[in-house]
Amino acid sequence: MPHVRRPELITVEASPTEVQEVAQRDLGLTPDADGALTGPLPNWADTGARQRLETRAVDGHATEVALGIENATRVPYFEWFLGPFLRRGARRALRHTAARLEAALEGRPPPPEPRRRTPLLPPVPFAPQAIALLGTVAAIAALANFGGALFGQTADSVTKTFGASNRGLGVALAVSRGGVLISLVAAALADRQGRRRLLLICFAGVCVTNAISAVAPGFIIFTGAQAMTRAFANGAFVVAGIAAVEEAPEGARAYALSMLALAYGAGFAIAVVLLPISDVAPQAWRIAFGISALSIFLLPRLARSLRETGRYIDLTRRTVRRGRGRVREVFARAYGFRFLLLGLAAFLTNFFSAPSAQLTNRFLTDEHGYSNTLIALFRAVTAGIPGLLGIIIAGKLAESRGRRPVAIVGLVVATIFQVMFFLGDGAVLWFAATFAIVAASAAAIVLAAFDTELFPTEVRGTSNALLLVCAVTGSAAGLLVATNLDDVVGGLGPAIAICGVAPLLAAAFVMPWLPEPADRELDDVSPSEV
């Protein structure tokens, strides 16, 4: 997190000695070697940051006080985005400290704590190690999602290159999810080999398989490569979510997942930004896959900045490798019912979300005559700021109101507006898509929180791997149903809309039975069995 370049300056009617005595007594500061006073910054986002107070005598009895922040941790890879929000929050924290100091010197009651926080600041402080890990994990997730989203965005151009029909596209998209067995193995191995190693392997796998896709001579080879891409991308998503939750402080697990979701969105946005390239030439879509492949050159830097999660390190110190990742523990009495509910939720929600996400571009192109450039604009308008808004809302409400209500309301609202989108025309498309992405983003954050929070550390990877199988099975089923019903129901839009029944069933009959993990410590929600 950034240093405050300009200190907060105030002038008080007191001597430097009086100011220092009051600062030590009321602000908890202690003398430093250079004569300044330093100490923790209360209620700030970074536990490693310290406030620094320097005094200088001015006219008569007055003293100029300079308040600043030192040892602030920078957010790797995302300082460019979070920096302005953090600097504003730091400035607000220093002003509050200055107000406390002035009140103490004048004998007044201390001012109330600031009520409003910068929207993207965490609800509780993060340790420097957690900041570094979350930033690096988010960067890997963004790059993996960029690579994994390319097929869905360029599907129309790819199928035209290889002469595939809607049905062929549906089969290819379903087959591309057939690599779930690799995802299953990768995510499960995270319990035995560690989060760090598997996350790096999955990222490298996305790059290599997209390199194959970029030069694929035929649709079969391309589809096979994308099956592997999807497998590695899904594995990266699962392990990234686990790492983010395990390293987050209590009270900020949903916030950590919301920041990870912002990174996913950034990766998806890159895929959308590159979409107009497909209009340049019949096979220009290959350029986007090539760019994804080139991101493998970032692997050494990512490996240097990524460390293992503290919870997993603690687990390895008290268990042997074969005691971790046992499938039978997922289905045991303590966690079996949770897995059944989450597996059903994963299948039902993905039965609709997969065709809704993967076939939207095809729907806009075939049924509404959108060009790739117009689709890119549509995505930017309806998914950019609205998606960010949904993620921020979910991160805050999931901690303050609970996971269950946010998940249920989010699923219902998102499904209703998505169905309106696929059955609508004209301005309805833009209106419905905007509100759908807000609600869908909120629901997705909470569902990811359930998946990671409701299982203990030793099987968190294995349980999420099995849930991924349920999700991918639902995705494949939804894609096949939607692409085979389009001729029967009069178009791709109505066919996808029919699939919207599934998440409504999940919201009504599955989500209410899940335990509520909000306001509870992670180890109390899912105590270890080893």
Label for each model-derived stretch:
Residues 132-164, 353-361, 478:
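Extracytoplasmic
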Residues 151-156, 334-388:
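Extracytoplasmic gate region of multi-pass secondary transporters
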Residues 163, 194, 215-220, 249, ...:
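Helix-breaking motifs and short loop linkers at transmembrane-helix boundaries and internal kinks
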Residues 173-188, 381-393:
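Central cavity-lining transmembrane alpha-helices of secondary-active solute carriers
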Residues 252-275, 279, 467-479:
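Glycine-rich segments within core transmembrane alpha-helices of 12-TM secondary carriers
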Residues 260-304:
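Helix-loop-helix hairpin linking two adjacent transmembrane segments in secondary transporters
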